[in-house]
Amino acid sequence: MDCFKVFEVVFQSEINPLLLIPAVATIALTLCCYCYHGYQWIRDRRTARIEEQQAQLPLPLSRISITPGCSMVATTKLTHSRNSVDIY
């Protein structure tokens, strides 16, 4: 249906067009709230997924370990190195 035909029907009817403003505003506000709710839901799911992945992966650990009886200080890197990005 053509847009102009809709306007013609509205203006020819006995309905006051000013009465349609609250209904249109309510529908627009409902649509905005629905879109914002979807945006929040997607953002929360993304945050939860990132937190879940961080909880599953061990933290990159680089520490100095001193072996008893040995004067040498060894650096130990457990699990991750700079090249471990290729694994994921």
From Swiss-Prot:
Localization of this protein: Early endosome membrane
Membrane topology category: Single-pass membrane protein
Gene (name only): hemo
Phenotype of the disrupted gene, per the record: Mutants reach adulthood and show no overt morphological defects but their hemocytes display a more vacuolated morphology than controls with enlarged endolysosomes which accumulate undigested phagocytic material due to impaired digestion. This leads to decreased resistance to bacterial infection and severely reduced lifespan.
Keyword 4Fe-4S on entry: no
The entry's keywords: Endosome, Membrane, Phagocytosis, Transmembrane, Transmembrane helix
UniProt keyword Magnesium present: no
Tissue expression as described in the entry: Expressed in hemocytes.
Record topology, Cytoplasmic segments: 38-88
Membrane-side (Lumenal) residue stretches: 1-14
Transmembrane segments: 15-37
One GO process term, biological-process aspect: positive regulation of defense response to bacterium
Function: Negatively regulates early endosome maturation by binding to and repressing the activity of 14-3-3zeta which prevents the 14-3-3zeta-mediated activation of phosphoinositide 3-kinase Pi3K68D. This, in turn, inhibits the Pi3K68D-mediated conversion of phosphatidylinositol to phosphatidylinositol-3-phosphate and prevents progression of early endosomes through the maturation process which regulates subsequent steps of phagocytic processing.
One GO CC term on file: early endosome membrane
Subunit and interaction comment: Interacts with 14-3-3zeta.
Name of the protein in its database record: Hemotin
InterPro entries with a match to the protein in the record: Hemotin (IPR047851)
